[in-house]
Amino acid sequence: MSHQPTTENDNRYWIGFDLGGTKMLATVFNSQFKKVGRARKKTKGRDGMKAGLLRINTVIQEALNDADVSADQVGGLGIGCPGPLDLAKRQIRTAPNLGWDDVPVADSIEKEFKFPVAIANDVDAGVFGEYKFGAGQNARCVFGIFPGTGIGGGCVYEGRLFRGA
């Protein structure tokens, strides 16, 4: 069954991607940010960066298939990435838990799917998500600590994300 957009004028879908030390998860949302598809796999970072980039693209395609959505219907993808990032180059500088360095993650996804990609630190993305859509809605300040394969913290104050090192 195909998911229809929820407004007449906006037929775009959006993808959120969480790249973690042990798992990767893609979720497809309709224009009202209702979940309509998802896919998840183990990250297997030690298989190497090139294998990891291919695995990311596979998970995205599986999520699109689950949602019965084609890439040309997607308005964009946001990916939360571990480790220090180069936001200007849209790359992971280093992801120690994965063993990857200088990863052109946004370019790889855009080359494959032809929709825009934004990257963010995974914890920053999680905290901002809670501020915008979760427990922190209507709060002036949201601070989060995210333990996982590693640990990180983030803060949103009056709608502004404060980025760390």
What are these regions (language model features)?
Residues 55-71:
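Conserved active-site "lid/cap" helical segment
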Residues 22, 82-85, 148-150:
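Short glycine-rich anion-binding loops that position phosphate/pyrophosphate groups of nucleotides
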Residues 8-58, 91-94, 161, 165:
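Short glycine-rich, Thr/Ser-proximal phosphate-binding strand/loop in the N-terminal lobe
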Residues 14-18, 74-78, 142-146, 152:
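Short glycine-aspartate micro-motif
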Residues 49-57, 73-77, 83-141:
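Glycine-rich phosphate-binding loop and adjoining helix at the ATP-binding site
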Residues 137-165:
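Glycine-rich phosphate-binding loop of actin/hexokinase-like ATP-binding domains
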Residues 30, 87, 156-157:
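Short, acidic, Ser/Thr-enriched surface-loop or helix-capping motifs
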Residues 1-14, 115-117, 135-142:
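Nucleotide/phosphate-binding catalytic cleft detector across ATP-hydrolyzing
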